[in-house]
Amino acid sequence: MSGEIKWLRQLNLFFVAMSFFTRIPVPSWVVIDSDKLNKASRYFGLVGLLIGLICALVFWLAQLILPASIAILLAMVAGVLVTGAFHEDGLADTADGFGGGWTVEDKLRIMKDSRLGSYGALSLGLVLLLKWQLLVELALYSPMAAVSALVAGHTLSRVVASSLIFSEQYVRDDDTSKSKPIAQDQQLNDLFILIASGIFVLLWLNGVAAFVLFITLWLVRILLGGFFRKQIGGYTGDTLGAAQQISEVCCYLVILAVGLS
């Protein structure tokens, strides 16, 4: 009986993580509160895996009757619809704040502004275009290459972004912030489970691609963490979104450059 209760508790945490990252409805019995959200960080990578599988499925079905370029676009649209452009919004806000603010206070204020500025629009456009082009090249090489890239990119990018929670300082004091509960007292075993989901996905790739991707994302994480500390002294929910988008692009770049060689 206790084993069943523990299993249901973990399933509840997975659904909490899914409700945080996506627009997918969760069962009515799921309990969502700050404490559950804090513990659900261990499953952020698995939610990324789910999102990647959905995008990969949309692409695979679409490419059966449509050109690869359109199929990839539909897969990207599916990702945006599933997540509500959660991470893309964070990227745009981060670009606006870092590009338009001089002081830490200015940057945080601009990032909280819901209006889209020129830096945000430019960064969002460039990242989306780059993701589309990279995925199209992979799809033209092999549909399965694009499928693998979508699954790996969505999963690993969320592992990288979420891992920053465990080492960086959360810098917003606003109690209404959606990300604040996940920043409180993270446990080491949560980090291990998060990393394990990333390692599981790396095993899908060939040995060289997996190794290069691991090293690349490790370096990206170090650079992003240092950059965020320099800019605002730590991280916010918006910078985690930016980290996810940047890491996703890096995944596609590495898989295209190394995984197909």
Curated annotation (Swiss-Prot):
Q: Which reaction does it catalyse?
A: alpha-ribazole + adenosylcob(III)inamide-GDP = adenosylcob(III)alamin + GMP + H(+); alpha-ribazole 5'-phosphate + adenosylcob(III)inamide-GDP = adenosylcob(III)alamin 5'-phosphate + GMP + H(+)
Listed GO CC annotations: plasma membrane
Its membrane topology: Multi-pass membrane protein
State its Enzyme Commission number(s).
Answer: 2.7.8.26
Give the residue range of the signal peptide.
none
Query: Keywords, A to Z?
Result: Cell inner membrane, Cell membrane, Cobalamin biosynthesis, Magnesium, Membrane, Transferase, Transmembrane, Transmembrane helix
Q: Which cofactor does it need?
A: Mg(2+)
This protein's source sits in the domain of life called: Bacteria
One of the GO BP terms on file: cobalamin biosynthetic process
Query: What InterPro entries is this protein classified in?
Result: CobS
**Pathways per UniProt:** Cofactor biosynthesis; adenosylcobalamin biosynthesis; adenosylcobalamin from cob(II)yrinate a,c-diamide: step 7/7
Regions that span the bilayer:
12-32, 46-66, 67-87, 120-140, 199-219
Quote one Gene Ontology molecular function term.
adenosylcobinamide-GDP ribazoletransferase activity
Location of this chain's protein in the cell: Cell inner membrane
Known role? Joins adenosylcobinamide-GDP and alpha-ribazole to generate adenosylcobalamin (Ado-cobalamin). Also synthesizes adenosylcobalamin 5'-phosphate from adenosylcobinamide-GDP and alpha-ribazole 5'-phosphate.
For this chain, the family text in UniProt reads: Belongs to the CobS family.
The record's section on HAMAP family has:
CobS
UniProt protein name: Adenosylcobinamide-GDP ribazoletransferase
Taxonomic classification: Bacteria, Pseudomonadati, Pseudomonadota, Gammaproteobacteria, Alteromonadales
